[in-house]
C-alpha cells in the first residue's frame, strides 16, 4: 500500500490485526530502498523498553506511548515532516549548485551522488531512459520512481532533466560554453525548451545565470552569493 500511495509519513500501532505487527511493518519499510526515506512513528500501549528498543533498531523514527495527547502526536508529525522538507531542500540545492550546510544522512548524499554520476555518464547514450537508469541503480523502475519522488519531490523524468540542466550550468560556468552549446551537450535539441526549463529550475534565465555566477563559482561546484 505504501508503494502505491507514496505517503509522506506512516503511523502504525505496534499491535495490529493480521500476520504483521508494527515492528515488522517498520522493518519492511526501512529495508525497502524505495520506501526507507518515509518516516515511521510507532504507537504502543506498553512501557516495555525491550519492545521499544526493537522498534528503534528496526529504524522507527519516533515512538509514542499510549495514551497520548493529540497535540504531542501532531508536534512529532510536524517535526518529522519538517525534516522531510529539509531533505528535499538539500536535494534541490545540490541539483541547482547552491551551497547547503545542513546535515543529511550519508545514505541520501550517496544516493544523490550515484544518480548524478549515472545520468552524467549517459548524456550521450541514446539508449538511456528511465528503465536503463533504474537498472544502473540496481533498483526496479517503480522503486526508483518512488524513491526519487519521495526525497526530491520530482518525478523521475523531471529529476533526470534537472540533472542534465545541472551539468549544462557547470559547462556554461566552467567551460565557457554558450547556451546553445551547453544545451546540445547535455541532450536538449530544442534550445527554447532548454531555456524555459532552466529558468524554472534555477530561477534565472541561462544568460542571467551566467552573468551572475561565472566569476563566483567555487571548486566544490557551488555558486557563491
Give, region by region, the residue ranges found by the protein language model.
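Terminal helix-turn-helix DNA-binding modules in bacterial transcription factors
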Residues: 150-189, 212-225
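Alpha4 helix (beta4-alpha4-beta5 surface) of REC/receiver domains from two-component response regulators
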Residues: 20, 24, 31, 36, ...
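C-terminal output helix
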Residues: 68-77, 89
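Basic/polar phosphate-binding segments, predominantly the helix-turn-helix DNA-binding elements
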Residues: 130-159, 183-205
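The C-terminal output helix
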Residues: 78-93
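A Lys-centered signature of the CheY-like receiver
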Residues: 64-66
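Active-site beta3 strand of CheY-like receiver
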Residues: 5-11, 16
